[in-house]
A protein has these predicted regions:
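Glycine-centered tight beta-turn/hairpin loop motif at sheet-sheet or coil-to-beta transitions
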Residues: 125-127, 148-150, 162
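Short, surface-exposed loop or secondary-structure junction motifs
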Residues: 1-145
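Short, surface-exposed coil-to-beta transition loops
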Residues: 73, 149-153
Length: 170
């Protein structure tokens, strides 16, 4: 390990491979089935799915996808309509699917330093799969971004004065 657990941080897609293996081992299901049963169905997301092969990208509009192989990412890609991306984030962070202690952990971000180019945060941080930080105006933004050939997607949730709003932009 590069760090003693809890003392350091570095983003790594390999980390998501370990999460994939953990989900499959604990649930006894393939990742696709576990996501459908434990996330997509409970959150009411009928069109979101996992893409692991080029054939899985049929009908997905994401820039220059014709030459894109989602297999380069260990865990695959979540694909679906933008409105369901915003709903996923809103319902996941604002609902009761996850226990309160886990939501707190998801929001316990490790500070990453100063602003990151192309990101909305003045004071960015990273937690359990969640990018989070303070944006201009003092709003707390939580979410994530992703990119592929010819495309970028951002899904954010803003919580201010007890009210939340989520959006997704492609």
């Amino acid at each position: 390990l590069r760090y003693t657990p809890g003392t350091g941080w570095r983003y790594s897609n390999v980390g998501y491979l370990y999460v994939l293996r953990l989900i499959e081992r604990v649930s006894g299901l393939a990742l696709e089935q576990a996501l459908e049963q434990r996330l997509f169905a409970p959150l009411g997301l009928p069109c979101v799915r996992l893409a692991r092969t080029c054939a899985d990208l049929q009908g997905v509009h994401m820039g220059e996808a014709s030459a894109y192989d989602p297999g380069w990412v260990y865990h695959g890609l979540l694909v679906g309509p933008l409105d369901e991306a915003a709903l996923c984030l809103e319902r996941l962070l604002g609902g009761d699917l996850l226990p309160a202690w886990l939501l707190r952990e998801m929001h316990s971000a490790r500070a990453l330093g100063g602003p990151i180019a192309g990101r909305p945060w003045i004071a960015p941080g990273y937690a359990l799969g969640l990018m989070q930080g303070t944006a201009q105006g003092g709003q707390l933004l939580s979410g994530h971004t992703g990119c592929g050939p010819g495309s970028v997607v951002a899904v954010y949730r803003c919580l201010q004065n007890g009210k939340a709003a989520s959006c997704a932009v492609f």
